[in-house]
């Protein structure tokens, strides 16, 4: 009875072994089945571990299990079924074979022990060292645990903190920018109010001065109302009382704007406060529309040898053009009209800013229309042997060329070689032996434009005789504060004065060298004359000596003859 039961158990185990072989992968791995004694020992160990505390027991049992099954990569049969092994074998395509030893261990007598399928058994898989992975797919270390979750939580917290810090920094930067903008706006408003107060004060002073001048001159300007019935009556308007006479506050102030005319009430010539006759400044006149040349054109270019320094000034379309009369007046104060001569070239936009300003009568103003008038003079004047071209004559006449202010439009024209007006034509025809000074003046955003930098760089590189007087940072006419305003006119005058002194010094050295050469040449000529005189003197002396010798010989002969005669008489 026992033998039949053992045989049936063996047959059953054999069938299970065959099914296991057919279902497992074909990798040849030695497999051994643990005995019941070993299994009971492991179960006993696990039961001992379960008696400890829940957390400590769990960690220790996990570590024990890892120590038991990690070295030989073993697993418990109760953790998986043969059906799972079969599914895994179908998925595995490596072609390995697994051999399972299902024979029962033998006793010392040679009899096999009975195998009980009800008891849990373990299968050990032994993998070669080459095919071992760093971590088995059933290893506990690969499974996500609390430590990994804590790390992810820490990373999320760090990211949130960084985002909060970045937001705080952005808010602080915005607040600083807003404060800076407010400060700049306050400064601009303060300067505008100061400027307005200064202008009002100057207007008040100008009106008071005008009233004093009108009372001293005995001018009596009255107002007449226009009657509706008479059409031939004319109105005389007292312009100072009706309009404000604005004044520009500058050092050496002598510039006044023409009062604004009322469209409905024209101003008579008597009421004009800026006429040449009523002006308190001598040798100055108001700039008006061109009325043709005051003197023939040739008068300005036949004086190249007048022993004066010739300064040519160009003004372009910038509001800084109103400072040109200040520059001219200061140069005349330094040198005087006897030592320098100044001529001014203005463009069409520059005329708009110069209109109504007072200019010295020693200055000749050239406009764009004068070039065509110059051609008419060439046609009418038959005495000229050659046709004179205005921009050629200006280039020959000038010893230095100052363009102040230089607008962005004219700067672009000069950089690209455009010559569509008198000023640009003179510059295109300029000689590299004569220095040129340019003072740019424009809005801040026009000055920081990349094209402005490109134009200035090309001018300096292509024309080494050009010196750029860089603009300064100031409150512009539009109210903005920034770089782009023309250099201070006093600085421009000082730079021009230095260049004039340098040119004069170089000329004096050249003239000194020429005079020294002439003196040396004259000395050499004098030495030659002295040598010739010495030779003539020597010849004269020789002739005198010869004559003296002949005379002495003749006297001696006469004395001898007289002696002989005396001897004969005695005998």
UniProtKB/Swiss-Prot annotation:
Q: Name one GO cellular component term.
A: CoA-synthesizing protein complex
Compositionally skewed regions (Basic and acidic residues) per UniProt: 43-59
| A Gene Ontology BP annotation from the UniProt entry | coenzyme A biosynthetic process
Specify the superkingdom.
Eukaryota
InterPro entries reported in the protein's UniProt record: Flavin_trans-like, Flavoprotein
Give compartment(s).
Cytoplasm
- Kindly indicate where the leader peptide sits in this chain: none
Q: Which GO terms describe its molecular function?
A: catalytic activity; FMN binding; identical protein binding
Q: Which SUPFAM superfamilies match?
A: Homo-oligomeric flavin-containing Cys decarboxylases, HFCD
Residues recorded with modification Phosphoserine = 42, 116, 121, 124, 264
UniProt lists compositionally biased (Acidic residues) regions at 516-571
The region called Disordered is annotated at: 1-72, 100-120, 140-171, 209-244, 507-571
Keywords recorded for this protein, A-Z: Coenzyme A biosynthesis, Cytoplasm, Phosphoprotein
Which residue ranges have biased composition labelled Low complexity? 146-171
The entry's family comment says: Belongs to the HFCD (homooligomeric flavin containing Cys decarboxylase) superfamily.
Question: What do we know about how this protein assembles, alone or with others?
Answer: Component of the phosphopantothenoylcysteine decarboxylase (PPCDC) complex, a heterotrimer composed of CAB3, HAL3 and VHS3.
Q: Can you name this protein?
A: Coenzyme A biosynthesis protein 3
Please name the source species: Saccharomyces cerevisiae (strain ATCC 204508 / S288c) (Baker's yeast)
């Amino acid at each position: 009875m026992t033998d039949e039961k053992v045989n049936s158990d063996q047959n059953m185990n054999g069938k299970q072994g065959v099914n296991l072989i057919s279902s497992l992968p074909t990798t040849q791995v030695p497999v051994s089945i643990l005995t019941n004694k070993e299994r009971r020992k492991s179960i006993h160990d696990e039961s001992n571990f379960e008696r400890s505390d829940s957390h400590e027991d769990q960690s220790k049992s996990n570590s024990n299990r890892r120590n038991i099954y990690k070295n030989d990569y073993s697993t418990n049969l109760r953790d998986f079924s043969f059906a799972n092994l079969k599914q895994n074998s179908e998925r595995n395509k490596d072609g390995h074979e697994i051999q399972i030893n299902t024979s029962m261990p033998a006793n010392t007598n040679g009899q096999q022990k009975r195998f009980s399928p009800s008891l849990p058994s373990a299968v050990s898989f032994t993998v070669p060292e080459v095919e071992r992975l760093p971590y088995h797919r059933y290893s506990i270390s690969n499974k996500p645990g609390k430590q990994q979750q804590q790390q992810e939580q820490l990373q999320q917290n760090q990211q949130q903190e960084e985002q909060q810090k970045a937001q705080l920094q952005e808010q602080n930067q915005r607040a600083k920018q807003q404060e800076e903008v407010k400060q700049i706006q306050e400064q601009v408003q303060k300067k505008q109010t100061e400027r307005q107060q200064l202008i009002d004060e100057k207007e008040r002073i100008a009106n008071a001065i005008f009233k004093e001048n009108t009372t001293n001159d005995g001018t009596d300007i009255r107002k007449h109302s226009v009657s509706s019935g008479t059409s031939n009556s004319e109105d005389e308007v007292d312009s100072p009382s009706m309009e404000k006479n604005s004044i520009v506050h500058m050092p050496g102030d002598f510039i006044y704007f023409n009062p604004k005319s009322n469209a409905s009430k024209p101003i008579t010539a008597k009421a004009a406060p800026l006429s040449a006759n009523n002006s308190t400044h001598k040798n100055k006149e108001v700039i008006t529309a061109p009325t043709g040349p005051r003197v023939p054109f040739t008068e300005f270019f036949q004086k190249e040898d007048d022993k004066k320094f010739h300064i040519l000034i160009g003004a372009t379309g910038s509001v800084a053009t109103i400072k040109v009369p200040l520059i001219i007046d200061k140069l005349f104060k330094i040198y005087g009209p006897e030592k320098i001569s100044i001529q001014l070239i203005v463009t069409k936009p520059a005329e708009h800013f110069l209109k109504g300003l007072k200019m010295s009568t020693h200055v000749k103003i050239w406009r764009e229309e004068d070039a065509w008038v110059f051609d008419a003079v060439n046609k009418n004047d038959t005495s000229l042997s050659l046709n004179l071209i205005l921009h050629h004559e200006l280039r020959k006449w000038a010893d230095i060329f100052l363009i102040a202010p230089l607008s962005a439009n004219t700067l672009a024209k000069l950089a690209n070689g455009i010559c569509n007006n008198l000023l640009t034509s003179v510059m295109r025809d300029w000689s590299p032996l004569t220095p040129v000074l340019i003072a740019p003046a424009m809005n801040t955003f026009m000055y920081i434009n990349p094209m402005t930098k490109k134009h200035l760089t090309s001018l300096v590189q292509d024309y080494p005789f050009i010196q750029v007087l860089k603009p300064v940072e100031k409150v512009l006419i539009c109210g903005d504060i920034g770089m782009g305003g023309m250099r201070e006119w006093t600085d421009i005058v000082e730079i021009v004065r230095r260049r004039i002194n340098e040119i004069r010094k170089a000329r004096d050295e050249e003239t000194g060298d020429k005079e020294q050469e002439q003196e040396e040449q004259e000395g050499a000529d004098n030495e030659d004359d002295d040598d010739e005189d010495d030779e003539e003197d020597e010849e004269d002396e020789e002739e005198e000596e010869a004559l003296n010798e002949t005379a002495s010989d003749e006297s001696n002969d006469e004395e001898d003859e007289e002696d002989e005669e005396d001897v004969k008489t005695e005998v």
